[in-house]
Amino acid sequence: MAMEIFTVGRGQEGYPERLMPFADMPSRLFVRGALPADEQKTAAIVGARICTAYGKSQAAFFAQVLAANGVAVISGLACGIDAAAHEGALRGKGKTFAVLGCGVDICYPKQNYPLMRRMLENGGGVLSEFPPGAEPLPWHFPIRNRV
């Protein structure tokens, strides 16, 4: 799946307006696919990687309902709740976006590559403040959570 990676800097056209009020947001974002439009309604659904089947089903259900009603779903592409939220959004025929703790050229965990591919094919995107090639190091994930 080849898809161009682009960079958008804070204060530049295309940088998410909703992040501008926060001083600790990244100075630049690396993007593969698309970013949600500033006028797009969004909701973040995140949770544990190790979770119950009930938790996964509820995350998927809420994401599907949100997506079916025009709300883009944002999560982290991790196993568990995050992946269920992305799957639900796709079932709801909506867009879904992932904020990564690694470079946008890396799918972590690797088992979610088919999910990431479908997200991109359906008009969503993946974004990160970490440059392409950045490995998914443990301390990257708390940093990315602020986005």
What are these regions (language model features)?
Residues A2-V147:
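Glycine-biased, small-residue-rich flexible motifs in mid-sequence functional cores and linkers
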